[in-house]
Amino acid sequence: MCIRDRVGAEKAAQNPNHQGDEEYNYFMAVCFPAEQLTIIDYNRVVKDLNGLTPQAFLEALKKNFVVEEKGTDIYKPAALHNFSLYLEGKWYSLTAKPGTYDDNDPIGVLDVTISSNLILDEILGIKDLRSDKRIDFVGGIRGLGELKKRVDSGEMKMALALYPVSMKQLMDLSLIHI
């Protein structure tokens, strides 16, 4: 039973005059072709490196990522499993190594899961993204310049930009029952 059915049944049980044509029996939906939709990135900024020096942090990343320095010009992630890191005035490309994610797991294959597990949790010790005060989120509509600004201001120590979720990934997620 989906949420709409449960809510409708609950409302019907609360209504002694239920007829079946009440508004709660309907669910408004809209459909768009997938190729007409755009999903934007959702990025992270972090206040500290969990006691690591920038060099030690970069070294720790190499366990699960291919790390390439990209210079001072803003670097946008190029594909799924590629991340942009901004640290101490430089941009880096981080590409998840094969075997660090499972292509058959619709949640485990997501860049948000990869970055949360292998960077934020494993290296930076951020276990709960919702409550940890050391992390903040920056919507992609604000651009990667906002990430750079927040790090350069000293407010944050590093920024991590993610490639947007693909439409296929979103559709795959919609098919699982969590």
Language model: regions and residue ranges:
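Surface-exposed, charge/polar-rich loops and edge strands
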Residues: 4-176
